[in-house]
Amino acid sequence: IGKDTLEVLEKNKVDCACMKGLRCCGMPAWEQGDLETLRVNAQHNLEILIPFVEKGSKVLVINPTCSMMMRREYTELLDGEDRERAKKLSEAVNDPSEYLWNIRNEDRFNTDVNSMPNEKISYHAPCHLRAQGIGFKGRDLIKKITGSNVKTVMECCGHDGTYAMKVEGFDASKRIGQKSFDGMKSEESEVWATDCPLAALQFKQHAGVKPKHPMSILAEAYR
């Protein structure tokens, strides 16, 4: 997904760089009540990213859980100077589809595709992306660039961070996600899409189809 994202950004003349040394956003630690690890990771990430933010760079975050942490939770979970830096980071964080949607009226926005995905695509809207209030930009980009008919499924897949990875949460997560599994299947689409890699694992395990990330669908269309 990372390589596909870089390919799509390059096709749209976005000057980008991958930063070395970044740590986990801290969500798994937070879910276990380990606030110390969360704060250490957050402070480390701020040290790396803030110099670029202060120069005007955006921070594109592929995983919706990670972007939610950096955009919404760091500002609540950190104190003092770290909180002020977290506010700067929050304003700079974008989902890749969100960033590309925001430049759709610029000359560099690229709709010149060499292949088309299937006419009908089932798109799952991840909970952690919806929580950021940015709309469904992955879906909208696929529609705008490829012209595909994209059907949206809103129900939670049940993964919920690390919840579905635990023995005690596995069966419950499947029950919670059943409506989303049924919704994706009901469209009878050959291609499924979601912005969340964890949701993709949940669909693969319980519905038999692994959705593609919107960036992967677009990268294939550009090739």
Map each language-model feature to its residues.
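Iron-sulfur cluster-binding electron-transfer modules in prokaryotic oxidoreductases
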Residues: 1-223
